[in-house]
Amino acid sequence: MNRGIPFRHLLLVLQLALLPAVTQGKKVVLGKKGDTVELTCNASQKKNTQFHWKNSNQIKILGIQGSFLTKGPSKLSDRADSRKSLWDQGCFSMIIKNLKIEDSDTYICEVENKKEEVELLVFGLTANSDTHLLEGQSLTLTLESPPGSSPSVKCRSPGGKNIQGGRTLSVPQLERQDSGTWTCTVSQDQKTVEFKIDIVVLAFQKASSTVYKKEGEQVEFSFPPAFTLEKLTGSGELWWQAERASSSKSWITFDLKNKEVSVKRVTQDPKLQMGKKLPLHLTLPQALPQYAGSGNLTLALEAKTGKLHQEVNLVVMRATQFQENLTCEVWGPTSPKLTLSLKLENKGTTVSKQAKAVWVLNPEAGMWQCLLSDSGQVLLESNIKVVPTWPTPVQPMALIVLGGVAGLLLFTGLGIFFCVRCRHRRRQAERMSQIKRLLSEKKTCQCPHRFQKTCSPI
């Protein structure tokens, strides 16, 4: 009987030797479609030893034979590899490149009579449409996942917008702050994998802008895009609605090709000038009240449905003095909250109204400021100098001129007077001479009728 004990021990040892390799607990690894993943497998001893990687169908993927890496007939043969430099450290990981959704499987590493199972789940996250979208359009993200999985997805935009869901996520009405890199996290079996998706929202940096100018100043309109593209082709137009006009009209049309701007048509009044390079830039030679109003610039990009829009407003200020009235006026779209003021510099005299015109009757002399303000912040300022209302002193040169004119008039008048007097005297002398002659003729008269009265008939 004592001889039977060692024999039983021998059988037990033999059975243990013939047992299959012990399987370790399964690990879960998440991978991204098109990316590279490394499945780890470590031996207890830091030395080079034999190992094999197989798929769930027990088909060999790769392994070691002597000191060389060998590959089996699997579909991963051209994309699987191992780090030979780490074999001496007991690390026998398998690297899979250019991951595909169908690579999702359970992979088995056999080393030192033990098996390590690694479950690989490959996910893909893509945008259903182009990643270059116009402002206001919708973005849809679709998750590709292996059969049998139930992942959840959470995405965050550059502007802080959060969306979450299952295999489909939708973002309606994209805004310009949504442009940039979106970070999406896919979760499965308490594991996560992160995706980065670049979304470009095609829009101008500002939806609306207002330019404040004094009458006569040059006006600059700028329309910088909120995105950068190597090639940008399209066409655009600026429509303008002047405050004084009954209808809007097209001020300018242009073409855009490879970031070069060419003008197609421009009005003669006003005659805008346009820059030839991006960003889009327009110059109005003078700010006049008849131009104050609102405009809408549209840009239609090639191969895109829809247009980019930016609204621009022009507010014009005028300060005038007419007789005894000082007036400050503005034209163009202004908020009812804006305040228009007339203020005498270095004095407390101020007239303010939430209106488009203010005035002062009989203003004091000095420098007056016309101010358009929003909650104390000055948006536009124009200065006008008021002169005293009393007559200004006559200059010496004016006195000389006036004296000369008066002397000339006096001399002319005296000349005329003496000429008339002299002529009158001459005519009077002639008249007296004529009277004397007539009297002389009367004394010597021997008319026949006189003799008839004094003589008797014979």
UniProtKB/Swiss-Prot annotation:
Q: Which GO terms describe its cellular component?
A: cell surface; plasma membrane
**Disulfide bond among the record's keywords?**
yes
Any signal peptide, and if so, which residues? 1-25
Q: Where are the transmembrane segments?
A: 397-418
Ig-like C2-type domain span: 126-203, 204-317, 318-374
Q: Where is the lipid attached (S-palmitoyl cysteine)?
A: 419, 422
* Residues on Extracellular side: 26-396
SUPFAM superfamilies xref list: Immunoglobulin
Phosphoserine: residues carrying this PTM: 433, 440, 456
What SMART domains is this protein classified in? Answer: IG, IGc2, IGv
One GO molecular function term? coreceptor activity
Kinase recorded as keyword: no
Here the disulfide bonds are 41-109, 155-184, 328-370
Q: Which residues lie on this side of the membrane: Cytoplasmic?
A: 419-458
InterPro entries attached to this UniProt entry: CD4, CD4-extracel, Ig-like_dom, Ig-like_dom_sf, Ig-like_fold, Ig_C2-set, Ig_sub, Ig_sub2
What membrane topology does this protein have? Single-pass type I membrane protein
What is its biological role? Integral membrane glycoprotein that plays an essential role in the immune response and serves multiple functions in responses against both external and internal offenses. In T-cells, functions primarily as a coreceptor for MHC class II molecule:peptide complex. The antigens presented by class II peptides are derived from extracellular proteins while class I peptides are derived from cytosolic proteins. Interacts simultaneously with the T-cell receptor (TCR) and the MHC class II presented by antigen presenting cells (APCs).
Q: How does it assemble?
A: Forms disulfide-linked homodimers at the cell surface. Interacts with LCK. Interacts with PTK2/FAK1. Binds to P4HB/PDI. Interacts with IL16; this interaction induces a CD4-dependent signaling in lymphocytes. Interacts (via Ig-like V-type domain) with MHCII alpha chain (via alpha-2 domain) and beta chain (via beta-2 domain); this interaction increases the affinity of TCR for peptide-MHCII. CD4 oligomerization via Ig-like C2-type 2 and 3 domains appears to be required for stable binding to MHCII and adhesion between T cells and APCs.
Name of the protein in its database record: T-cell surface glycoprotein CD4
Give the originating organism.
Macaca fascicularis
Q: What taxonomic classification does the UniProt entry list for its organism?
A: Eukaryota, Metazoa, Chordata, Craniata, Vertebrata
